[in-house]
Structure formats: C-alpha cells, structure tokens
C-alpha cells in the first residue's frame, strides 16, 4: 500500500530498518556489489515505486540489494530482473511502469534495454538510470534518452537520471544536487 501523510516518515524509517535487516541476512550469499550499493539511492527507489505504484517493475543490471527496495515499494507488482538481454522477458502489450537501469559498465546493454522498455512506456512510467556520468559513452546515452520523443520531464541527479513520460507536462530537463 502507498504510504502518505506526516506519519509516512515513521513508516519509512520502519520499512528501511526492516529492509536493511533483510539485506544483511542475504549478504553472505551475495557478492560485494550487494553490500556497497548506495543507501540513498535504494531509499529513493523505494519512495519512487511507493509513490508511482507501478504494475510492472523491471530491474536491469547486476542483482543488487536495490531489488529488495523495489519489491517492497509495491508488493504484488510484476517484478522482472535481468542482468543480460536474454533474461528480459516482458509480456506483449504490458506497459513498463518502472525501470531501474543500473549496469552502467555496459552502455550497449543499457541502450538496448532502454530501447525495448521505452516502446512500452506509458504516461505514468518512470525510468531511473544509474551512472549517467560514468563515462563519455554514458553521458552520450543519457543525452539521447533525454531527447527521446517519448520522454517528458527529466532529472539529472549527477550520478542518477530520472525520466518521466507524462506528456501533459512541458518537456524540461532539470539538474538537481542529490
């Protein structure tokens, strides 16, 4: 269920604590990438999913602790994890409500996943792209994503980019210190 009101802060704190405990329990089974992912980014992902309440969540990149936060944001959402293109199975006609694209060491993979998912984006879709300033290739890819005809408002959080697809708003690119 979606968290609202001033009591949301307490609810979020409780959920963050529970997710951190679950993450620590699973850590021995995972690689170092699982442990060192940014807490701030994981919490942002949780809040975005919780606010948007997407029916479909796509997590494209190496399996990481962020998967716990994405799933917890909306329980019951159709969650798809793909660390390579062959794992990206999406039902025909089903829109992608939320995409977390975080394999910035492989810009070709990110571009292909974006191409597949942008065709399935709807007005409520939100895509979060990690590593937008990691390399010159990623900077160029981020610029192309911002200029895509489907994309409306974008937020550049320096290492993270957020794309909104609501075309009722005027297309605008914001740079925000995060």
Language-model features, listed with the residues they occupy:
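Single conserved hydrophobic/aromatic residue that forms the stacking wall/gate
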Residues: 1-8, 12
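A glycine-rich, hydrophobic loop/mini-helix early in the fold
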Residues: 16, 22-37
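SAM cofactor-binding core of SAM-dependent methyltransferases
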Residues: 32-94
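A conditional alpha-helix N-cap/helix-loop micro-motif detector
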Residues: 38-39, 106-110
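Short, surface-exposed connector motifs at secondary-structure boundaries
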Residues: 52-54, 96, 122-127
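Short His-Asn-centered micro-motif
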Residues: 59-61, 82-83, 101-103, 129-132
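Short SAM/SAH-binding signature in class I
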Residues: 94-101
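C-terminal substrate-binding/active-site "lid" region of AdoMet-derived donor-dependent transferases
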Residues: 109-178
